[in-house]
Amino acid sequence: MANNKSSKKRVQIAERNRLENKSYKSAMRTLMKRCFSACSNYSQQPGETAKANVKASIDSAFSKIDKAVKRGVLHRNTAAHQKSRLSAAVKQAIEPAPST
């Protein structure tokens, strides 16, 4: 337990930052899920509107991930991993692997 004024304040600040980071990560995960669902929708029913939806969702997810790194919520290697997952899903949805 905190014994002096500065350590009590640090506990409060850490809790505040934890909650902010938690909500930011949650928003980021939501955008990633939207991107994955847009990819699956496009795979099932290809079309120009579905393709535009995929592009918009990946752009917003990438933006949120990059901002999370900038704010210190996420490590840059973790962000690169997440962006790679999204890119692979979009690539597979838009350009499916040819059957050989």
Curated annotation (Swiss-Prot):
Keywords: Ribonucleoprotein, Ribosomal protein, RNA-binding, rRNA-binding. Coiled coil: none annotated. GO terms for biological process: translation. The keyword rRNA-binding applies. One of its GO terms (molecular function) is structural constituent of ribosome. GO terms for cellular component: cytosol; small ribosomal subunit. It comes from the Bacteria. Residues 79-100 are annotated as: Disordered. Disulfide bonds: none annotated. Binds directly to 16S ribosomal RNA. Belongs to the bacterial ribosomal protein bS20 family. NCBIfam families: S20. This is Small ribosomal subunit protein bS20. The gene is rpsT.
